[in-house]
């Protein structure tokens, strides 16, 4: 009996408090994404990075940061749609590993008859770690947001009966 009462109080408190956990995870995902793109964009290996792929990557980074920030504000107020958005952009972060970083790892450029790797293994591991951690933050924030939003919605529906 006591545990049920404590659980109801905890759920009732959700009506008046913000979902800071999901929100903070989304903001951390943005920080990790910034570390990723700073590492990639500061690389200067010939003209390999001067391509349409980098242009698309820059646009995606801007969209990712915008969507993640909007989602962080939305999940803070238990809006389930933004939690699903976090899940989607988390999956997008995983997919990004196989686009630019993987291509750069296997690519080489020749400058003055000397062949250089576009991305060395250490940098590849770093950028993949940033993307994976960013994805993990988005996915965890999304899962927490969905669970809490559903819990709160069910409780509010029960109160309306």
Per-range role (PLM):
Residues 65-78, 135-161:
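Cytosolic juxtamembrane helix at the C-terminal end of the final transmembrane segment
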């Amino acid at each position: 009996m006591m545990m049920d009462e404590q659980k109801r109080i905890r759920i009732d408190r959700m009506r008046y408090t913000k979902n800071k956990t999901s929100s903070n995870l989304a903001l951390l995902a943005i920080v990790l994404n910034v570390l990723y793109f700073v590492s990639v964009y500061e690389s200067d290996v010939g003209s390999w990075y001067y391509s349409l792929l980098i242009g698309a990557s820059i646009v995606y980074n801007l969209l990712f940061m915008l969507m993640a920030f909007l989602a962080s504000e939305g999940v803070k107020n238990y809006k389930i749609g933004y939690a699903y958005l976090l899940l989607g952009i988390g999956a997008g972060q995983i997919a990004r590993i196989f686009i630019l970083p993987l291509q750069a790892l296997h690519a080489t450029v020749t400058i003055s008859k000397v062949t250089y790797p576009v991305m060395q293994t250490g940098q590849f591991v770093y950028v993949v770690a940033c993307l994976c951690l960013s994805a993990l933050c988005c996915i965890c924030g999304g899962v927490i947001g969905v669970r809490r939003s559903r819990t709160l919605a069910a409780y509010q529906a029960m109160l309306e009966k």
